[in-house]
Amino acid sequence: MYRLLALVALASMADCSALLTHITGTSIPGQLFINRQFLAVNPDGAVYGTIESDNVDTIFKRVAVDRNRIVIQNAITCVYLCMDRCGQLYGSKTLSKDCFMREFLEKNNYNTYYKVYDRKLTYVALKNDGTPRKLQISKSRKLGKLSVYAMALLKRLSFPIYTSCPNIKSEIIVRHRKCHV
């Protein structure tokens, strides 16, 4: 009797897990689609937007470091997406304070990626031409019409990616880049 109940429970769990395949962890590779283009980071650190979905610079993995912070890393070149205090986006091969971001799931199922500096939210955003946009608003304001530049969709890859990137350690390195105002 107990074996039959255990068998039925296992079968129902297998059915449920098949229905929940869209819910996956943060380290699954994918592409971030922001403002009608894919976010890309060159190995030399340049951040840009492209419409080419087969570009290797657009394949990222989001890794949860702790409850409130994630790191966005290129799954092929192992370059981290970072943002300095001025809101400038850049890529870095070394992990620093600038590379830790927050992710927020909006009501419309889009994600926003941001950092908090001096009571201001600084978002990962792209202009219409694909260049990074500095988008910084106070904590009390809503994104509103500026959300076009910062709302991101995560497109999961339909094929497996095997990376040779080292594991991310949660220790924080000093700020990587000085902000020049």
UniProtKB/Swiss-Prot annotation:
The lineage of its organism: Viruses, Viruses incertae sedis, Naldaviricetes, Lefavirales, Baculoviridae. Belongs to the heparin-binding growth factors family. GO terms for molecular function: growth factor activity. Residues 1-16 form the signal peptide. InterPro entries: Fibroblast_GF_fam, IL1/FGF. This is Fibroblast growth factor homolog. Pfam families: FGF. Keywords: Growth factor, Signal. It comes from Autographa californica nuclear polyhedrosis virus (AcMNPV). It comes from the Viruses.
